[in-house]
Amino acid sequence: MIRRGDVYLADLSPVQGSEQGGVRPVVIIQNDTGNKYSPTVIVAAITGRINKAKIPTHVEIEKKKYKLDKDSVILLEQIRTLDKKRLKEKLTYLSDDKMKEVDNALMISLGLNAVAHQKN
């Protein structure tokens, strides 16, 4: 079963403009109920270009810890819904601590922490 925090190789083509494309790693960010019942899955793209600008929506992941080809960055500003058929091979699973970083970056990307601050 596909689980939140899994890292898969996925085919993101075709793309337009600045979208991440090709066959590349993605992290599953959809909840596990959706992962179980939906034919689609919500993912964030991962890039091996760690020289990309360090912005609050980026989460670094280490190649040794996660058995990747190179140190990488999860791009939480590059989220999209994919048909599960685009997922090719499971590569690894992110730790709970790393997923907390993903959640924080995702909240920033979606503007959810601004909403939380307005309610307090």
UniProtKB/Swiss-Prot annotation:
Subunit structure: Homodimer. Forms a complex with MazE which inhibits the endoribonuclease activity of MazF.
Family stated for the protein in its record: Belongs to the PemK/MazF family.
Species name: Staphylococcus aureus (strain N315)
Temperature dependence: Thermostable at 90 degrees Celsius.
GO biological process: mRNA catabolic process; rRNA catabolic process
Lineage: Bacteria, Bacillati, Bacillota, Bacilli, Bacillales
Keyword line: Endonuclease, Hydrolase, Nuclease, RNA-binding, Toxin-antitoxin system
Pfam families, per database record: PemK_toxin
GO molecular function, one term: RNA endonuclease activity
Listed EC numbers: 3.1.-.-
Gene3D superfamilies, sorted: 2.30.30.110
Protein known as: Endoribonuclease MazF
Hydrolase as UniProt keyword: yes
Methyltransferase as UniProt keyword: no
